[in-house]
Amino acid sequence: KLHLLGYGIEKDGGIYHMCEDIKSKKRELIHGIIDSLIARGYRFDKKDLEMLFSMNDKALTKVDIARLLVKYGEARSVNEAYNTILAPYKIGSKVRAEASVVTSLIKEDNGICILAHPGDIEKKYGIDILDILDDLRKIGIDGIEVFNSKHTPEDVVRFLKIAKERSLLITGGSDYHGM
């Protein structure tokens, strides 16, 4: 599971439409999670749900549900709600796209494609980013996110060296998803 970032893409291109389709699928999955939680005895205020689903520009996530669970006193924090009550519910695996498709669409839309938080990938999957970087470059990766809130200073030095040696673009980000 890789996170790819598209910079400078055209607003109404193929990647935009693919993201809109994914957003729509995620809304359906979020609706299903809420239905399941209600069946398990959790209560949701109708007005809160109406407001949540009226945000058409927003890609709904489990974090949105977690915030409501905290509001209703079902958990002390968003992280607690996310990691306990919502842990059994998987969304990401149901709305993924192949990396080659994503990079191709970003390129068709005149964008550049960046591999997000490579340090996180290494830690989660126990792989060395160098083992997959050449394959990623072949499918269109233009750069890597060197500066990231999850990267240690040593990670930053290492990824900066890797990017420079391979003439890859260098970016930074926080990986903040509202939690």
Located regions from the model:
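Conserved, well-ordered alpha-helix/loop/beta-strand core segments that scaffold catalytic motifs
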Residues: 94-123, 127-137
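Short Asp/Glu-rich motifs
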Residues: 56, 88, 125-126, 155
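Short beta-strands and strand-loop turn motifs
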Residues: 84, 114-118, 143-146
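Hydrophobic, aromatic-enriched interface-forming segments
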Residues: 40-100
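A metal-dependent hydrolase metal-coordination microenvironment
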Residues: 1-60, 139, 145-179
